[in-house]
Amino acid sequence: MSFKILKILVCGLFFLNAHLWEKQDNSFLGVAERAYKSGNYSKAASYFKKACNDGVSEGCTQLGIIYENGQGTRIDYKKALEYYKTACQADDREGCFGLGGLYDEGLGTAQNYQEAIDAYAKACVLKHPKSCYNLGIIYDRKIKGNADQAVTYYQKSCNFDMAKGCYVLGVAYEKGFLEVKQSNHKAVIYYLKACRLDDGQACRALGSLFENGDAGLDEDFEVAFDYLQKACGLNNSGGCASLGSMYMLGRYVKKDPQKAFNFFKQACDMGSAVSCSRMGFMYSQGDAVPKDLRKALDNYERGCDMGDEVGCFALAGMYYNMKDKENAIMIYDKGCKLGMKQACENLTKLRGY
């Protein structure tokens, strides 16, 4: 390469870098954001504070987030509250959302639902979906007698594509909750939107409705399977558990114990109690997996600990067969309290009365 060409390349790079430097945001906020992304929270906080003092509301909000989460500093909810309040007063919707959250949970201040409502409402007007949803939660679960307000704000959150808001409305219309008139048609519409927005619970609900022909829908296995598969892919334990049951029983699909086991394992790991118990059964029978009573006991125990009465019943039976009467009584008692009649009967026999 000739010296002349090299000189041209070097000059070109110099001017390119100069151009990029001119394009780089070197405002207080820009410097703060780059520092924050790189994990230099101390520098980020310093520049967010400068931005905030300059009247840039986003800088105030980001300071609130840093103090609320203890990023590069100790958690300080009072300072977070102060910065969120400043941001919210400047119509920063994220600042209002953060402020509402602290009042809602009573962090850095006394819990105050009215203050939370005021902050969330301002953010909701500024089109912050989660704030609208949180207003729905407050009116639904925390301040009783406001079902109409809850529906209004769940609807607003759904309109802003907040999947969970759509799902909650689906449940309300399917079950007739929140004082709405029960409507299968509306329930399905809301579930469909929530599922399109990747809400696993909504996809699972649709799968169950199509599988059983409920809510005025025709039974359609193929559609049900697709929705359950999507639910499972979105880490919904119920969707995975339902697929496991289909393959275990050969319902609508070719019976495949190995696939059933895999889905049950996936569901169990996500917290499905009944799926853990079903894995216990498969280990006890050597179905799709080598027979292993230790693993059977462990999985029945997982299911029982998570509240599956069948898992408790099976676990107690294993302890009884192992001549461990004390544990058998304790677990039958738990199964009985969970509502399993046979566990109550066995408990009575073991206690001798």
Write out the residue ranges for each language-model feature.
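N-terminal leader/linker segments that initiate helical-solenoid repeat arrays
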Residues: 17-42, 46-47
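Short helix-capping/linker turns of helical repeat alpha-solenoids
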Residues: 35-36, 53-56, 69-71, 89-92, ...
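Hydrophobic face of amphipathic alpha-helices that form TPR/SEL1-like repeat modules
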Residues: 28-35, 62-69, 98-105, 134-141, ...
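Structural motif corresponding to the intra-repeat A-B loop/turn of tetratricopeptide repeats
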Residues: 38, 74, 110, 142-144, ...
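Terminal, low-structured helical/coil segments at or just beyond the last alpha-helical repeat
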Residues: 334-353
